Amino acid sequence: MTEKRYLKWYNKVGYGSGDIAGNVVYAFLSSFVMIYLTNTVGLNPGIVGTLIAFSKLLDGVTDIFFGSLIDKTHSKMGKARPWMLYGYIGCAITLVAIFAIPTNLGQFAQYAWFLIAYTLLNAVFYTANNIAYSALTALVTKNSAEQVEMGSWRFMFAFATSLLIQSITLGAVTALGGGAAGWRTVAIIYAIIGLLVNTLSVFSVKELPEGELVDTTDKKEIEQDEKYNLVQAAKLLVGNKYYMMICITYILQQIYGAMISMGTYYATYILGNQNLFGVFSWAVNIPLILALVFTPTLVAKWSGMYKLNVMSYTLATVARALVAVAGYMGSGNVTLMLLFTAIAALGQGPWQGDMNAVIAACSEYTWLTKHKRVDGTMYSCTSLGVKLGGGLGTAITGWLLAASHFDSALAVQPESCISMLKIMYLVIPFALDAIITFILSRMKVEEANEKLRAAV
């Protein structure tokens, strides 16, 4: 029997465009906040890393809190869309604030400014926006194929935006005056673009009636499914082993991204050409986009996501090992590094495309085992993973830079820093890919759901 389809092509494209807005924040922040703070504002990378780590203490609580709020929201716009719409206004304001730290402030005040703006962006506004955006995958369609297609469109836009931002930002900062003024102007432009695209994405889809989502029109039954407090919500999540696997995988992916963002330092101080960072960004993002184009077809051909995810990430792990080998052979092997970087990205693509559908399957697993609808809360793993993983990754890079005696005033860094940059950019990404591959090999949620449905 063919599954009912709920979406037109323009609904999927409109939804996917929402990650343009998301990556105007995330890609810009993760790729450039450290080099902006160290080389323009003049802050210590170790202290910045510690402040980011401190900020992350709030994130786990706010993720579950906002996820639970979304599950309990009833409005004309639905459960998630209001949070996605209004949350981004705060994202835009705080993004500009982070890249507009006054250079004439005392250093203590600069650290405080950064901590407050960064915490508000991540723990409050980005959390509300991103969880709501991710939860829409399960709220606008019940068709698993459409959920994979939504994820593919979403991440095609995400990686295209990330590629564009990584390629043009440094040049744009210079063209707009350079220094603090250049960074501030670029941040304002990105924030305005994000605000417009996010609004378009919100109104491109419509949530299904709550009764249709739970296959009942009984209002009391729907309300009963939503009766749980914050502690119970946390227990539901922790009790779902597949949620924990996805959450850990998401965190590791974001730490991976933070290490790859060290390409700005690697290109500048090891390869001797900061513009090569943009070239490596192309080698990462173009293969990812190509993989996403074919992900829905491959999922359908292989009758599920499990086998595709494990095989493709195994390829990515092998390729990242070869990137490391090429990198340690010397700077003359940039061509080999680019080739293997592209192959690794191609292997990472399918998981990016079907990840939201896997999360929807995790939510169904909780419904089948606990009889609770926790779609919004379940998608907290996306926001938690992005913020905790990205923040922790950025913090680690700051600590490692400080420990290796990085000095932004030096054109040539000490050998200790050069060695550390190689470890961060070459070795750690390979190790993270290997761990993710192992976790994905245990991610058999589709099989578990089939057994549970058969037992009913």
Name each model-derived stretch.
Residues 2-456:
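Membrane-embedded alpha-helical bundles of multi-pass transporters/translocases
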